[in-house]
Amino acid sequence: MADFVGSWKLEHSENMDGVWKALGVPSDMVDKARNEKPEFTFELEGNKMTIKMVSSLKTKTTTFTFGEEFKDETFDNRTVMSTVTKDSENKITQVQKGPEHTTHIVREVTGDKMVITITVGDVKAVNTLRKM
């Protein structure tokens, strides 16, 4: 899990528009978010992880215990119930359950690169982050 710890910057995004559309995110919010290059900080303390995302649109901090469901707020202000599990030392999976959609977010670290795969139904987006 130590590979996650540190600061990361979005380098490339593929098909986030498709995921946002599948989630019903308002088009004005999509237009604002489309060109953002947020920075992320991952911290780990025992079985708890904190993920902080900073962009010009929003700063969001999420702290969770692996394997325990928690109330979460998405970037577009939807309330969901999330559970994050450790798949391996360099891979975690988050499942967000909302009233209308279930979103799967897989984060996997290889070296100085993190690939985040977001799936809503049959729509998939891939974000690539680079360690700073």
UniProtKB/Swiss-Prot annotation:
Residue numbers of N-acetylalanine PTMs: 2
UniProt entry keywords in alphabetical sequence: Acetylation, Lipid-binding, Transport
Source domain of life: Eukaryota
Coiled-coil residue spans: none
MF terms (GO), sorted A to Z: lipid binding
Pfam families assigned: Lipocalin_7
Family statement drawn from the similarity comment of this UniProt entry: Belongs to the calycin superfamily. Fatty-acid binding protein (FABP) family.
Name of the protein in its database record: Fatty acid-binding protein type 2
